[in-house]
């Protein structure tokens, strides 16, 4: 485990880049780290260092979610670079779930594309409160075509408003991530302008410190001689070293003790809401815990398989189904970090749900997971999101 202590003197905010494939999300992430490094606030990162999974290179599309950290004068940021390709939206959902705000990257040469819309919708669905927009590749627009950038901005503002964001007041910054990464001063200035907008527009999240501890498990690995480590984002509460937690969902609930806490390879005495932490668990076999479970304060949350929910079925244009679904439909329900198959029961008199409809229905999962009223989820089939919802009432 790590040896350094983690600095809590600055506000900590989780953000990430979202947007259409090849619009420049990873280049922008590298540019932010590199420009801030010149001010001594970050470590410079190359594009390749962020775009780091081997399978990404083969296809030239980002698959895994990369985590980097940097500072502005005001804050410490943990930044996730989210995958852009539709096939990898499942990863995007786990990535977007870790955002207190996001930077939407839109190429001025293209404007809003299908995945731009899908990511804005997903951001809303997973509870990202605000975003800042970076209009990228502005260096590729000829001066005489400058009004094209204005049109793209108008279009994206309308899109934000449509999906429930503040389209009128959201800050837009124009620039070129590639030129900034290559050290062109006027484009580096745009990156500082962008980070200033992020510092001011994206609010420091109200940390849920007072609520009982809960962390969704994203990944599990073994440290030889030490034991099993579960990683994820602390959704709420605080956890001190040597405190008890329960492993909840999918399997029978099990108690354990947390004997180590780390964040960005630095040791912590406690983990708190908003942290991306690794927890060392006493006496837990690697096979006894899996992605999709949660670690929670004992007794604070119990697993459920049946609940009522309000759902929205995406339209064909939003990437949803082209046809209605009927009562025998058995999609996957994506909660926090995992898919669980479930069946549906419609309200009396309803025979099907059309794309674009908002309905209330009952869900029965094949395995119980940690849910409560207000828990958000998405409905997926064959690797694509076809709807989303919120738990309105626990049944059993």
Curated annotation (Swiss-Prot):
Family statement: Belongs to the TRAFAC class translation factor GTPase superfamily. Classic translation factor GTPase family. EF-Tu/EF-1A subfamily.
Enzyme's top EC category: hydrolase
Record key words, sorted: Cytoplasm, Elongation factor, GTP-binding, Hydrolase, Magnesium, Metal-binding, Nucleotide-binding, Protein biosynthesis
GO cellular component: cytosol
Region (G5): 176-178
Pfam families hit by this protein: GTP_EFTU (PF00009), GTP_EFTU_D2 (PF03144), GTP_EFTU_D3 (PF03143)
Role played: GTP hydrolase that promotes the GTP-dependent binding of aminoacyl-tRNA to the A-site of ribosomes during protein biosynthesis.
GO molecular function, one term: translation elongation factor activity
Domain tr-type G positions: 10-206
Record-linked InterPro entries: EF-Tu_GTP-bd, EF-Tu_GTPase, EFTu-like_2, EFTU_2, G_TR_CS, P-loop_NTPase, Small_GTP-bd, T_Tr_GTP-bd_dom
Catalyzed reactions: GTP + H2O = GDP + phosphate + H(+)
Subunit structure comment from the entry: Monomer.
Region (G2): 60-64
UniProt key word Mitochondrion: no
Protein name, entry field: Elongation factor Tu
Gene it is expressed from: tuf
Region G3: start-end pairs: 81-84
Annotated residues for binding of Mg(2+): 26
EC number(s) from the headed UniProt entry: 3.6.5.3
Species, as recorded: Mycoplasmopsis agalactiae (strain NCTC 10123 / CIP 59.7 / PG2)
């Amino acid at each position: 485990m790590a040896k350094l202590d983690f600095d809590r003197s600055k506000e900590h905010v989780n953000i990430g880049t979202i947007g259409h494939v090849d619009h420049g999300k990873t280049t922008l992430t590298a540019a932010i780290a590199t420009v801030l490094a010149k001010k001594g606030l970050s470590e410079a990162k190359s594009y390749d260092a962020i775009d780091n999974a081997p399978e990404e290179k083969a296809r030239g599309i980002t698959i895994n979610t990369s985590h980097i950290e940097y500072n502005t004068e005001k804050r410490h940021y943990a930044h996730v670079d989210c995958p852009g390709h539709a096939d990898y939206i499942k990863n995007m959902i786990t990535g977007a779930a870790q955002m207190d705000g996001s930077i939407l990257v839109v190429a001025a040469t293209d404007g809003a594309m299908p995945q731009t819309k899908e990511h804005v919708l997903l951001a809303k669905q997973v509870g990202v409160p605000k975003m800042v927009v970076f209009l990228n590749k502005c260096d590729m627009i000829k001066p005489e075509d400058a009004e094209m950038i204005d049109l793209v901005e108008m279009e994206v503002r309308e899109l934000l408003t449509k999906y429930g964001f503040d389209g009128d007041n959201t800050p837009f910054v124009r620039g070129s991530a590639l030129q900034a990464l290559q050290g062109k001063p006027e484009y580096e200035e745009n990156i500082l302008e962008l980070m200033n907008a992020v510092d001011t527009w994206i609010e420091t999240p109200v940390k849920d410190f007072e609520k009982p501890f809960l962390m969704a498990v994203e990944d599990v690995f073994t440290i030889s001689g030490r034991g099993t480590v579960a990683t994820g984002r602390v959704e709420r509460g605080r956890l001190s070293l040597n405190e008890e937690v329960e492993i909840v969902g999918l399997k029978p609930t099990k108690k354990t003790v947390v004997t180590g806490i780390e964040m960005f390879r630095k040791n912590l005495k406690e983990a708190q809401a908003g942290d991306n932490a690794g927890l060392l668990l006493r006496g837990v076999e690697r096979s006894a815990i899996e992605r999709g479970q949660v670690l929670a304060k004992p007794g604070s949350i119990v697993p459920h398989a049946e609940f009522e929910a309000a759902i929205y079925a995406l339209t064909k244009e939003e990437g949803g189904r082209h046809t209605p679904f009927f009562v025998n439909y058995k999609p996957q329900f994506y909660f926090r970090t995992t898919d669980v198959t479930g069946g549906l029961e419609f309200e009396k008199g309803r025979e099907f749900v059309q794309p674009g409809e908002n309905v209330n229905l009952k869900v029965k999962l094949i395995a119980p997971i940690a849910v409560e009223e207000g828990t958000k989820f998405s409905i997926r089939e064959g690797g694509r999101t076809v709807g989303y919802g919120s738990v309105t009432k626990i049944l059993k």
